[in-house]
């Protein structure tokens, strides 16, 4: 029973057309693959669907195939629709493959219509000769041009780039992405995996080049940042933020120019610059090489130093105005530093660490900006918090310049004084080491003065400076510096296990051990002696949760129970019971299996 011959003409019904298209497209691709494998030839099939989607099959890299096509002379064999119009009596295989282009002919423009049938560009000449509507593909009839009208200048310039095959292929790539932005994922599968075999050097450029033109054409609302091409178009006030971190390492001075530009572009909103400028310098400090930070950190700061009262007056009326834009900028900054950005300014670790909790007169937005600024300056510079958040608008440049002379000396001393205060604690740690008794006394004095908590071990003095309830990972950058600067070094968290009650008993012996075994402090298993066993119980609550009563009561239990459970007899008894239980189910399933077999 032969298959019913269908009349080759345009299918009007959308459903039937889509089904036929899918089936015949699959058959065409399969035939192309078989032809490529059986005959060791390179086959490329490109289909421009009626839904503006691009379908393609290529036995090798599509760009390389198209590049080679340009160098070939006139095709040895060329067929178009007219070659098949009168030949409908051929065998079924040709029926299956060749009609596909003619089905698509009514749904798409003429050039794409025949493309699927053969190597994509062969029909190009045919259409240039016969179909007046296909005038665009004049440059060697490459089928990419008909798809998009805008980047035709590239098409015109393409012949000049024919000297290098790779450059030609790279030019074809962007246009392909231009014409059909939806299928890049499919293009990605077709292009990006294969190129690695052919020319890995050219392909990274090819992979990158399609995108910029795509956004250049589809996202024209972003002409300003030429190099910064964020994957999603955003309003123009924000791209400078994207652009700033990218250019900082190379062009530090443009950033300093950008920060005033942002302030001037939004003069009516006085407090928008407050958030914008702290944000830019923060990222500047991240990415600028160490030679430049002073240059850029200073210009924004003088703006923040002038009168606090005037800034407060302006913040009041402008709170409503700032609400739309600063949240967006804060979201950007929060992505850059997820740990330190506080949801509630009072609840942030840094707010407690630097004493930001009390000042409530300032608007919460400026405080959050301040907390973010200090989160970045945390490692090297700890500056008076209340001074920065209140940043009057940059337009009064004269005051900013006048303050600049003052700000440079004013701001730099505070970090020195703070760092001086911290080292004032550090020498105490150094003094503590030689004599154990003095070590105890100085530690307790230090910690009690800092937080009012009574601490016995010097290790606890350092966490307490961050307040007892503080989560430890965030302050680690600053606290780690303090710990490492002391002679006791980083092992403090690990090597100070004794609980508050037992530490007085074990103080001398334990400190001697600690001095010896500090480098191996990360291994609690070394402290398994009876005198030191309780140490982990104080170590965990102190380190993880801050010393509070319930924690110290709760945590020892998991520490004491698991070790006996594994070592004592009941553990083995339980294992034996489990083995017995395992045996009984094993016998059970066998019986059940036989029963099941008998049933079936």
Swiss-Prot record:
It holds the Pfam family SRF-TF. Residues 222-242, 386-397, 490-501 have a biased composition (Pro residues). Its main location: nucleus. Residues 243-260, 440-452, 503-515 have a biased composition (Low complexity). Transcription factor; part of cell wall integrity (CWI) signaling pathway composed of pkcA, the bck1-mkk2-mpka MAPK cascade and the downstream rlmA transcription regulator. The CWI signaling pathway regulates cell wall integrity and pyomelanin formation. CWI also controls oxidative stress response, gliotoxin production, iron adaptation and asexual development. Finally, CWI is constitutively required for A.fumigatus to cope with the temperature increase found in the mammalian lung environment, during infection. Positively regulates the phosphorylation of mpkA. Residues 151-160, 328-339, 453-468 have a biased composition (Polar residues). It comes from Aspergillus fumigatus (strain ATCC MYA-4609 / CBS 101355 / FGSC A1100 / Af293). This is Transcription factor rlmA.
């Amino acid at each position: 029973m032969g298959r019913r011959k269908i009349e080759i003409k345009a299918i009007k019904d959308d459903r039937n057309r889509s089904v036929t298209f899918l089936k015949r497209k699959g058959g065409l691709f399969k035939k192309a693959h078989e032809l490529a494998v059986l005959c060791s030839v390179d086959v490329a099939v490109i289909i421009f669907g009626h839904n503006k989607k691009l379908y393609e099959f290529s036995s090798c890299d599509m760009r390389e195939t198209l590049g080679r096509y340009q160098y070939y002379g006139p095709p040895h064999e060329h067929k178009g629709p007219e070659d098949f119009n009168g030949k409908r009596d051929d065998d079924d295989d040709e029926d299956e493959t060749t009609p596909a282009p003619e089905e698509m002919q009514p749904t798409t423009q003429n050039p794409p219509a025949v493309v699927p049938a053969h190597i994509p560009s062969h029909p190009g000449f045919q259409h240039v000769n016969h179909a007046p509507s296909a005038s665009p593909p004049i440059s060697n009839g490459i089928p990419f041009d008909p798809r998009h009208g805008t980047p035709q200048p590239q098409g015109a310039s393409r012949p000049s780039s024919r000297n290098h095959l790779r450059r030609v292929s790279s030019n074809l790539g962007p246009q392909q992405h231009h014409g059909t932005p939806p299928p890049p994922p499919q293009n990605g599968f077709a292009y990006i995996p294969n190129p690695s075999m052919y020319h890995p050097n050219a392909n990274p450029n090819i992979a990158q080049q399609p995108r910029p033109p795509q956004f250049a054409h589809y996202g024209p609302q972003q002409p300003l940042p030429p190099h910064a091409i964020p994957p999603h178009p955003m309003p123009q006030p924000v791209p400078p933020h994207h652009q700033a971190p990218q250019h900082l390492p190379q062009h530090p001075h443009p950033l300093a120019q950008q920060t005033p530009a942002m302030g001037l572009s939004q003069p009516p909103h006085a407090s928008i610059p407050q958030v914008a400028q702290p944000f830019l310098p923060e990222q500047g400090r991240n990415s600028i090489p160490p030679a430049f930070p002073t240059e850029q950190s200073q210009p924004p700061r003088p703006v923040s130093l002038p009168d606090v009262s005037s800034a407060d007056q302006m913040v009041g009326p402008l709170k409503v105005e700032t609400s739309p834009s600063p949240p967006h900028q804060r979201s950007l900054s929060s992505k850059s530093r997820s740990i330190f950005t506080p949801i509630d300014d009072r609840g942030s670790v840094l707010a407690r660490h630097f004493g930001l909790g009390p000042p409530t007169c300032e608007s919460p937005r400026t405080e959050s900006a301040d907390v973010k600024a200090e989160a970045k300056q945390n490692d090297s510079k700890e500056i008076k918090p209340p001074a920065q958040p209140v940043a009057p608008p940059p337009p009064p440049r004269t005051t900013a310049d006048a303050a600049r002379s003052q700000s440079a000396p004013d701001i730099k001393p505070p970090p020195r004084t703070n760092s001086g205060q911290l080292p004032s604690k550090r020498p105490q740690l150094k003094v503590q080491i030689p004599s154990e008794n003095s070590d105890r006394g100085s530690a307790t004095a230090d910690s009690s003065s800092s937080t009012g908590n009574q601490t016995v071990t010097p290790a606890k003095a350092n966490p307490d400076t961050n307040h007892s309830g503080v989560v430890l990972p965030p302050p680690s950058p600053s606290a780690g510096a303090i710990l490492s600067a002391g002679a006791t070094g980083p092992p403090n968290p690990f090597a100070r296990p004794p609980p508050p009650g037992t530490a007085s008993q074990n103080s001398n012996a334990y400190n001697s051990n600690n001095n010896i075994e500090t480098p191996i402090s990360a291994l609690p298993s070394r402290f398994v002696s009876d005198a030191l066993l309780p140490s982990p119980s104080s170590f965990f609550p102190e380190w993880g949760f801050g010393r509070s009563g319930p924690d110290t009561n709760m945590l020892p239990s998991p520490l004491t129970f698991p070790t006996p459970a594994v070592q004592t007899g009941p553990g083995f008894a339980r294992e034996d019971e489990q083995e017995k239980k395992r045996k009984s189910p094993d016998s059970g399933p066998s019986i059940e299996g036989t029963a099941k077999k008998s049933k079936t």
